[in-house]
């Protein structure tokens, strides 16, 4: 029995579970042969994946470093402390908690620490670029709290901060949320701070989409202006899938330690925390600044070329990694566009646009992001080609010869910019 147990834990995945091994290999091939334009996705380094797939997955470590409920935590303590130190240094924060399993968990911990059921929260409408956890009725944030939503202006499709201020003065929320999932413009955190102070509200920045750009100094930082900041550690930060909470005030930050554990989670995922530490270390390197600048430059080229081809872009452009196509300009739905680009090995997602007449299951938009392909080495010239492939496919959806040409151009682009060199 002992020999059989040892054999099972030392067997390679291809031997112990060929079905899963085969599916993982198929996914690896898909990533290598498709153009990944989902704005919330990126490609981590092999070092990040090695940390996440390590023996740390075996270790339980409830509590904080040096305050655990389990023994044998001396090494995971050191790893978690390193992740915390790197997060604080990268973002200029006084306090950090690296344990949240996701961005949604990080947001929930903030609500648990600062609010009572029935309190009023104010965030951007989901259809205008907000997030489910910012008060959507299908999310716990929309069930536990009174929710007031702000949105963009119809003409500019950008935020009008005076309109946000007037809404806050009227509703007097306990918490204001800024930071979005489909807003392509720079966020004025200082203006939000002024509004929050005027109405006596806490200010939460959910910078999940722009964290990498903030870390690199390519987008203004919310740290100095907000009471608390949450983020994911993937997307533009290019780490593992997970969450992070940051504060400018260490004493205030300790509220969230208790809200994470034992308030909303049990044992932290120390293998993921190790991977977060690796990614945060990578983001502290000069190369990450160059990468983030390229992400924005590529997005602006993508938005510009798409518009040149006659397809409207929400707000007329972008300041970050996001480009949101308004397909009403060509009489197409997001659902159809998503299927069309998928047929030529381009991965994106249908998305609502401001004042969308379609349902969230159909939508009038297609959301694109440049972070993942920039990781592969795509530059402005390559993204101009990507824009043309997308436009050709959407503008002539019935033309099979155009479809075949698009598939070949995608194949050539993937060949020019290989993903992972060496075996995984």
From Swiss-Prot:
(6S)-5,6,7,8-tetrahydrofolate binds at residues 126, 130-132, 359-361. Pfam families: SHMT. Pathway: One-carbon metabolism; tetrahydrofolate interconversion; Amino-acid biosynthesis; glycine biosynthesis; glycine from L-serine: step 1/1. Its main location: cytoplasm. InterPro entries: PyrdxlP-dep_Trfase, PyrdxlP-dep_Trfase_major, PyrdxlP-dep_Trfase_small, Ser_HO-MeTrfase, Ser_HO-MeTrfase-like, Ser_HO-MeTrfase_PLP_BS, SHMT-like_dom. GO terms for cellular component: cytosol. Belongs to the SHMT family. This is Serine hydroxymethyltransferase. It comes from Prochlorococcus marinus (strain MIT 9303).
């Amino acid at each position: 029995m002992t020999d059989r147990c040892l054999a099972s834990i030392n067997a390679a995945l291809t031997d112990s579970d060929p079905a899963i091994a085969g599916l993982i290999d198929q996914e690896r091939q898909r990533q290598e042969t498709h153009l990944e334009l989902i704005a919330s996705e990126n490609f981590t380094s092999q070092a990040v994946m090695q940390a996440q797939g390590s023996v740390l997955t075996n270790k339980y470590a409830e509590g904080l470093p040096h305050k655990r409920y389990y023994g044998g935590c001396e090494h995971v303590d050191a790893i978690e402390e390193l992740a915390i130190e790197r997060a604080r240094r990268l973002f200029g924060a006084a306090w950090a908690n690296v344990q949240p399993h996701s961005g949604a968990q990080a947001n929930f911990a903030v609500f648990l620490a600062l609010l009572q059921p029935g309190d009023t929260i104010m965030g951007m409408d989901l259809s205008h670029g907000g997030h489910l956890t910012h008060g959507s009725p299908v999310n716990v944030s929309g069930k536990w709290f009174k929710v007031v939503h702000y949105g963009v202006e119809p003409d500019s499709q950008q935020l009008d901060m005076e309109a946000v201020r007037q809404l806050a003065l009227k509703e007097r929320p306990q918490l204001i949320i800024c930071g979005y999932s489909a807003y392509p413009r720079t966020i004025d955190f200082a203006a939000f701070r002024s509004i929050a102070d005027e109405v006596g509200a806490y200010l939460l920045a959910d910078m999940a989409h722009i964290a990498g750009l903030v870390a690199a100094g390519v987008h203004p930082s919310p740290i100095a202006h907000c009471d608390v900041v949450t983020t994911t550690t993937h997307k533009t930060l290019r780490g593992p899938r997970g969450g992070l909470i940051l504060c400018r005030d260490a004493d205030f930050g300790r509220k969230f330690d208790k809200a994470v554990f034992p308030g909303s989670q049990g044992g932290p995922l120390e293998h993921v925390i190790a991977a977060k530490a690796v990614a945060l270390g990578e983001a502290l390197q000069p190369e990450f600044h160059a990468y983030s600048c390229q992400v924005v430059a590529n997005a602006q080229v993508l938005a510009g070329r798409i518009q040149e081809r006659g397809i409207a872009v929400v707000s007329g452009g972008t300041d970050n990694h996001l480009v949101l196509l308004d397909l009403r300009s060509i009489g197409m739905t997001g659902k159809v566009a998503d299927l069309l680009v998928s047929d030529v090995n381009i991965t994106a997602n249908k998305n609502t646009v401001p004042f969308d007449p379609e349902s969230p299951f159909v939508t009038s938009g297609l959301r694109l992001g440049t972070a993942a392909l920039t990781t592969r080495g795509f530059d402005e010239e390559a993204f101009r080609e990507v824009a043309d492939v997308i436009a050709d496919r959407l503008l002539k959806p019935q033309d099979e010869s155009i479809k075949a040409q698009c598939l070949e151009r995608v194949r050539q682009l993937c060949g020019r910019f290989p993903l992972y060199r060496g075996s995984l």
